[in-house]
Regions:
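Glycine- and Gly-Pro-enriched alpha-helical subdomains that act as flexible
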Residues: 56-79, 83-87
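Blade-level signature of beta-propeller repeat domains, shared across WD40, Kelch, NHL, RCC1
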Residues: 151-193
């Protein structure tokens, strides 16, 4: 297969912002970056993160997860300057049940689904639908037997909304694996229209 052919098959994410993480999950050396598709340039927008995860960009606002300090932060994104301005925490870190990981917007964009990665010795996992305006938890999902919820994906079909959750098993101690038999499973939650 030619190089040009492979490139033609690649799908690009329209979100021009991505984050990095410290592999040891201990030091705030990660950052949020902007990728300019036209110039193919990358520039740092905001540093000092430990594990930049879920993102949602809409109408000049960016919601970003930094997992280790347990923050879900809203920023004003100035695309002309390529700058981020922190505005507020969506919810206080102490209110979050575990480490926030992946995030996806719900239809309409007024709330997001947040998946929580729990490294503790617990059996079940949690994900929440959080209203962006005030941090209120609208829906809580319990994923039985799988404490490390990583990535939600929201699908709309025939007027109904479904949420898919991926979960992790990598690095899970055997004693936790014994009480979490569904770790690594994909879960589906159907929501009413």
């Amino acid at each position: 297969m030619s190089r040009e052919k492979r490139g033609a098959e690649i799908q690009t994410d329209p979100l021009p912002i991505f984050g990095t993480k410290h592999l040891g999950f201990r030091e705030p050396v990660a950052a949020l970056y902007h990728y300019d598709h036209a110039t193919r340039q990358v520039r740092e927008l905001f540093g000092g993160q430990t594990c930049s995860n879920g993102k949602y960009l809409r109408d000049g606002l960016l919601v970003d997860i930094d997992s280790k300090p347990k923050t879900i932060t809203e920023y004003r994104y100035d695309s002309a300057l390529g700058a981020l301005h922190p505005l507020r925490l969506i919810a206080p870190p102490e209110a979050l049940p575990a480490l926030p990981d992946g995030m996806r917007p719900m239809p309409g964009g007024k709330s997001v689904i947040v998946a929580y990665y729990n490294p503790a010795h617990v059996a079940d996992g949690i994900a929440q639908e959080i209203r962006l305006s005030d941090g209120e938890v609208l829906t809580e999902f319990v994923l039985p037997g799988s404490p490390r919820v990583t990535c939600p994906e929201v699908w709309e079909r025939d007027g109904a909304t479904c949420v898919f959750f991926t979960t992790a098993i990598e690095g899970m101690p055997e004693e936790t694996r014994a009480i979490a038999p569904e770790a690594g499973t994909i879960f589906v939650a159907g929501l009413t229209a």
